[in-house]
């Protein structure tokens, strides 16, 4: 069942197209008089206890099947060559099946910046086992309640999740990132996570891979919930009050360097990409994908130069305009 389900996730992730992307409702104000040379632009950022050379990473996607193994090897090669973080999909499949080697990418990519992922439904003992076996630089702990509810074989008991989060925060020996899975993390959840000691979250909003869509494609039911959750930019707007206390990572529908920059303008420390990179490795050779990702770095620098920003922190000073749903939501937030 696990193998079939993981391969279905890949298939349905690749086929879905979102009719709305919140990044299109943000317009950045161009600066006509430049302040910096292009070679002065610094892309480095800091989160999860370390400095990173680039403000984007390959986010958790897959594992637990032969197809997942093939994809993970390609993604690991891209990430290692480009010097960016790669986070594997949920390690739960390997915990259930010790012979599953679909997550074993470090031996063939020794310089890889590797993260891994586990669900908050799993007790901390399994999180500790995951860290021991994978030796990651960070551990994503994902929350996916709507996905679980839509899965015929999904979890139905959730009372333990908060105590699990407290345990993870206290006992896991590497930095943890509390991660949504495409439904947009709300401010109250960030507040509760902060109380438990969490200092880094991935908001992962609607607009990219929809696990509601994926599970409804698998079961053929409840497709009216396919657009459940908050869009990525909406989740980021909602989290503004927390950006000085909690490191905000952002993912969900990020398509290109301009989308990345828009996240960074609103205080994100870094930006995760899943389906965009998955589509690339399924369409082009690994060498071609490496060239594309390296090009993203150059594009980030030129956009920052045109905005008069020498550092990632400078981007938070950029003026912007909001349109459509984002503007309406921000106006409502002002009145609340």
From Swiss-Prot:
One of its GO terms (molecular function) is NADPH binding. InterPro entries: Aldolase_TIM, FMN-dep_DH, IPdP_isomerase. Keywords: Cytoplasm, Flavoprotein, FMN, Isomerase, Isoprene biosynthesis, Magnesium, Metal-binding, NADP. Its main location: cytoplasm. The keyword Magnesium applies. It catalyses: isopentenyl diphosphate = dimethylallyl diphosphate. The keyword Metal-binding applies. Mg(2+) binds at residue 148. Belongs to the IPP isomerase type 2 family. This is Isopentenyl-diphosphate delta-isomerase. The gene is fni.
């Amino acid at each position: 069942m696990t193998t079939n389900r993981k391969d279905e996730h890949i298939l349905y992730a690749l086929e879905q197209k979102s009719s709305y992307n919140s990044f299109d409702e943000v317009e950045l104000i161009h600066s006509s008089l430049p302040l910096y040379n292009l070679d002065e632009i610094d892309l480095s950022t800091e989160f999860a206890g370390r400095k990173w050379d680039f403000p984007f990473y390959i986010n958790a996607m897959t594992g637990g099947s032969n197809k997942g193994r093939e994809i993970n090897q390609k993604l690991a090669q891209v990430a290692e060559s480009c010097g960016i973080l790669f986070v594997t999909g949920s390690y739960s499949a390997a915990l259930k099946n010790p012979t599953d080697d679909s997550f074993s990418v470090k031996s063939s990519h020794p310089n890889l910046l590797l993260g891994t992922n586990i669900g908050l439904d799993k007790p901390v003992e399994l999180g500790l086992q995951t860290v021991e076996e994978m030796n990651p630089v960070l551990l994503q702990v994902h929350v996916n309640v709507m996905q679980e509810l839509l899965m015929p074989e999904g979890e139905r008991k959730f009372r333990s999740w908060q105590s699990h989060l407290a345990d993870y925060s206290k006992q896991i020996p590497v930095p943890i990132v509390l991660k949504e899975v495409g439904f947009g993390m709300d401010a109250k959840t960030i507040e509760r996570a902060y109380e438990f000691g969490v200092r880094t979250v991935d908001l992962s909003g609607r607009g990219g891979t929809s696990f509601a869509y994926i599970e409804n494609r698998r079961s053929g039911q409840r497709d009216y919930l396919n657009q459940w959750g908050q869009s990525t930019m909406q989740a980021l707007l909602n989290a503004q009050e927390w950006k000085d206390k909690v490191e905000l990572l952002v993912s969900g529908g990020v398509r290109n360097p301009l989308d990345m920059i828009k996240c960074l303008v609103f205080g994100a420390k870094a930006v995760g990409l899943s389906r965009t990179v998955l589509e690339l490795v399924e369409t082009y050779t690994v060498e071609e994908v490496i060239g594309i990702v390296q090009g993203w770095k150059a594009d980030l620098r030129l956009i920052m130069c045109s905005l008069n920003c020498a550092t990632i922190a400078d981007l938070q000073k950029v003026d912007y305009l909001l349109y459509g749903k984002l503007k309406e939501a921000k106006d409502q937030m002002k009145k609340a």
